[in-house]
Amino acid sequence: MSQEKIPTVEVQMKIRRPVSEVFQAFIDPAITTHFWFTRSSGKLEVGKTVTWEWEMYQISTSVLTKEIQADKFISTEWGNPATTVDYIFQSLSDGSTYLIIKNYGFELEGEELISAIKDNTGGFTTVIDGLKAYLEHGIRLNLIGDKFPKEVMDHGN
């Protein structure tokens, strides 16, 4: 029996901070809002749906947390149609963290699938880059807000 390969976005990066700190950066919106979305209705908790907002674009999304393993793994479902986003945290011997983000479950085909994979790969890469700058150096790069300035794109409308 042949296995069909599932289209998956995968991005990764070494973050020079302890795994517990990197993990909390995704659980706690008081931290996440420094590098990703601008507002959240709450912390990630299993079985709970929160709303993430990007106020500069006047868009929001509902995020369902499916699974959490402290300092190891977070699985969420979000988007329309919904896809799964897994965050995998691996502690490295030097006290840093290797973070992997996987996004899969796309109900698209052809050019629409290619476009979604491309957009989400770029988007999650931007998230990790912002996280790295913030946690390692305390710098808020404003990458998400600068990705689609009003003057060049009518994003989300």
Segments predicted by a language model, with ranges:
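Hydrophobic pocket/interface hotspot
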Residues: V22-F26, T32, V50, T65, ...
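Hydrophobic ligand-binding cavity/cleft-lining segments
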Residues: M1-S41, N157
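Residues at helix-coil transition
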Residues: I27-D28, F37, A70, D129, ...
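Generic structural detector for well-ordered beta-strands
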Residues: E10-K14, E53, L64, I88
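A short, structured loop/turn motif at beta-sheet edges
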Residues: V19-S20, K66-D71, F89-Y98
